[in-house]
Amino acid sequence: GTTKGQFGGVFKINPQVDDIPDQFAISHEGVKLLILGSIPEGGGGCFCPESTLLKSLLRHLIIKRDEAVILDMEAGLEHLGRGSTAGMDALIVVVEPGQRSIQTAQHIKKLAADLQVKKVFIVGNKVQNESDKELIKNGLPEFDLLGYMSFNTAIIQADKEGRAPYDLDERIKREVEEVLKNLEKKGVER
């Protein structure tokens, strides 16, 4: 990108990416993890070169290598605005029981349609009761709902400790399995 306070700069719009997955991915039980980074500091300049690299890498993984790709993106609309998710088969939007979250999900669905994302699903998150479930379900009737993740102090504690929450609580496992089962019913394979 550019440096703070400077203009322009040139970056390659078709960077070579074919060696990135094999060179930088961490592999565990056949699953490769590739951490793509984030914006390092406020006012750091244009993020266009990084977005171009990401789009090229995704195109390479999906089209040339025919790999299944899961993106865990930061909350917000930036990736949709930059087109990083263009052409994806499916997008899962995590929705909390509140009007701002519901409105954001509606906006995400519109942006996803602009990018020809084929399916947009939702998962209710931090749900504490039936009223929370109804708020999400009734607020987003046009979405395919995959399931709910309960508000759970085990997740908060795991985050504080820098641990994965999945193995800490059986309820978490059940809820994740339910989401996966519903995703498969909708035609998205594991």
PLM-predicted stretches and their roles:
Residues 49-148, 156-157:
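Conserved catalytic-core segment of NTP-binding enzymes
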Residues 40-49:
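Flexible beta-alpha connector loops of hexameric P-loop NTPases
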Residues 1-29:
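N-terminal phosphate/diphosphate-binding loop that engages ATP/GTP or pyrophosphate donors
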Residues 36, 150-151:
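Active-site donor-binding loop signature of nucleotide-sugar glycosyltransferases
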Residues 30-40:
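Short, basic/glycine-rich phosphate-binding loops at helix/coil junctions
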Residues 159-172:
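C-terminal boundary of histidine-terminating zinc-finger modules
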Residues 33, 68-70, 164-165:
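Residue-level preference for the first positions of well-ordered beta-strands
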Residues 175-190:
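C-terminal alpha-helix
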